[in-house]
Every structure is written in C-alpha cells, then in structure tokens.
Amino acid sequence: MNVPATRKDLMIVNMGPHHPSMHGVLRLIVTLDGEDVIDCEPILGYLHRGMEKIAENRTIIQYLPYVTRWDYLATMFTEAITVNGPELLGNIQVPKRAGYIRVIMLELSRIASHLLWLGPFMADIGAQTPFFYIFRERELVYDLFEAATGMRMMHNFFRIGGVASDLPHGWIDKCLDFCDYFLTGVTEYQKLITRNPIFLERVEGVGIVGTEEAINWGLSGPMLRASGVQWDLRKVDHYECYDEFDWEIQWQKEGDSLARYLVRIGEMLESIKIIQQALEGIPGGPYENLETRRFDRERDSEWNDFEYRFISKKTSPTFELPKQELYVRVEAPKGELGIFLIGDQSGFPWRWKIRPPGFINLQILPELVKRMKLADIMTILGSIDIIMGEVDR
C-alpha cells in the first residue's frame, strides 16, 4: 500500500475577485503554510473607471452624479466633498437651514453605511441573523432619503451653496420617529452580538493595530479611533455646523476587530443624537444661496448659436473655479475622504485628486493578516470596511 507523501511546500490561493467576503471585486493572492498566512498581496483596479480624469472634463454640476459612484453606500459624503471645495474657493456662504439639512442627511448616510457594514461583517464570521436585521433599519433610512431627495441611492441632493430642495411636509416628524425606533434596534444588536461568546472568540485580539502604527500608516476613521487616537474631522475641521451640537468622539484603545466594531456601534448612537438635535433646532430660511449664480460665466450668444435658437432652454450652470489650489476633507463613515482641487479660472477643474479612505486603510491588510489563520482574513478585511468603488475610483 502506497502512503502519499506529505508535501511541505507553501500553497498560493487566490481569494476573489468574486469571493463573497471580498466586498467587491478585490483579489487577494494569499500564501499559506497549512492554515497559517505567510503573505497576502491585494490586487486592485478591477473597478477603475477614471473618475479623476472624468472630473477634469466636466463642470462641478455635471460631475455631481458621477461622485455618487465612488462610495455608493454613503453617497451624501461624496456629494458634500464635491460642493465644499468650490464653496471654499469661491467664499460662498451656505444658509443655516441648508447646513442643518446637510448634517441630517450626512448622519443618516453614516448610519446606513455602518448598518451595511455590520450585516456582511457578521455574515463573514458566521452569524447570519444580524444580516437580516440590519436591512430592516436600513430600509427605513432609505425611505427617508427617498421622501427628501426622490432617490433611495445616488441622491444627487447637494448643490453649491445649499441643497437641491427643502424637506417635505411631515418629514421631520417621520425622521424623529425613526430615531426613537433605531435606538431600540441598536440595543437589540448589542444584546445579540456584543456579549456573544462565539463572536468575541472570532474578533477579540484579531487584527491589532497599535497607536503609532495607525498614525504611520495614515489610517483614518474607525480604523484610527479604534487604536486610541481621538481624531474626528467633524471636531477638528469644524465644517458644516457640527460645532452647534453636543456629541462625543467614539474611540477605543485595543485596536483589534472588536474595538473597530464598538467604535462603529457607538458612532451610530452619536449620529442619532446629532440628528435629533438638528431636527429640533432646524431654523427657517432658504435652502440654497442664490448668490452662487453670480459665478456663472456670462454668455455672448452668437447668431444661430444653440442657446440663441432655443429661447426657452435653461442655460447650463458654468461655475468658474478661481485660480487657486485647495485640499478639502470630510469625515466619511470609512475615514477621511479628501479632494485636492486646482482651479484655473475655467468651468473645469485643472486637477481633481481624490483621497479615498478605503484605499489608504486597505494598505495595512498584508501586515495584519501575516501569522494569522486563513479564517481570520475575512474578519480583518471585514473590520476595515472597504468599498471597491472608492478604492479603485
């Protein structure tokens, strides 16, 4: 009888780009010694669409529908960063009511993003029940978005100097009811998940990132705050009207997957606090700064020109970007979402550089999974929270 010889050489495994735990078209080339991970190389670019180059050939208003395809689970933040840059370059003041509406929409979008992180993350480590629970609350958030913007996703709601429309009648009461209901939902998650011994075995002490390590790798968002760094751009940069609300930065010291989970759960509760304060104190007034139209380029329509022939045609907005450069950033659900913008006195940006949080946070993955077990790759990758639309751009 021939006994097969035991092979001791390393095994290379491809995870993705169609693996259900890759959260998009991410491919990992994993080198294994049995169940132990020796090396891991992420392969990116499967969802690259040239978003930066497209921006340089569009006006800001024309480009707004494109930006919702970066992080398509938190589209309000990509819209906010797109209009914040021109507003700062042109020194445009946003009406107070518009600022409050923006904050409400941003925090609702943060909750929706964290919910759709929580469900697949739990499914990755073997807990199927929360996956169905989170869709129950997420549908309520999308109902609010649909009532206010007309779209469940890809809202196209932000405008330079304000928002596209005011809140409809009865929307504020509906949103307050959601806040009260959602607090009970989070309590249910904590009972079901946080003290579950099987869950704790899978996440506690897995994927530890130290404080210095997190700073050196340029991590941001929950990845940074779970490592003991109290850094939140809503407190640091004082954008929109976050300074007018009472809320706390959520952070943990341990730096493992459990700490990142606790930070995101805490952030959802803080978002509810911000939304409730904004809804109760929302001021009256306009929802858009009409003075932004003074930045439109004057047209001298020639005879037989397209815009001359069609008298009833509404002229397309051509907001001129001053000849300056600017870096603007917001605290997105996954971290620091930034744009480096250079204007050259034309309707198109001369340079539009995107700093996606998922792309930066993903770089530490090979370091975290080394010397871990194969099953821990899903736990660590899920705790990072990436969306390939913004990673590949």
From Swiss-Prot:
Record-level GO BP terms: photosynthesis, light reaction
UniProt record similarity statement:
Belongs to the complex I 49 kDa subunit family.
Q: Which organism is it from?
A: Manihot esculenta
Chief location of this protein? plastid
Give the PANTHER family listed for this entry: NADH DEHYDROGENASE [UBIQUINONE] IRON-SULFUR PROTEIN 2, MITOCHONDRIAL (PTHR11993:SF10), NADH-UBIQUINONE OXIDOREDUCTASE 49 KDA SUBUNIT (PTHR11993)
Q: Which GO terms describe its cellular component?
A: chloroplast thylakoid membrane
Q: What does this protein do?
A: NDH shuttles electrons from NAD(P)H:plastoquinone, via FMN and iron-sulfur (Fe-S) centers, to quinones in the photosynthetic chain and possibly in a chloroplast respiratory chain. The immediate electron acceptor for the enzyme in this species is believed to be plastoquinone. Couples the redox reaction to proton translocation, and thus conserves the redox energy in a proton gradient.
What name does this protein carry?
NAD(P)H-quinone oxidoreductase subunit H, chloroplastic
Q: Does the keyword Transport apply?
A: yes
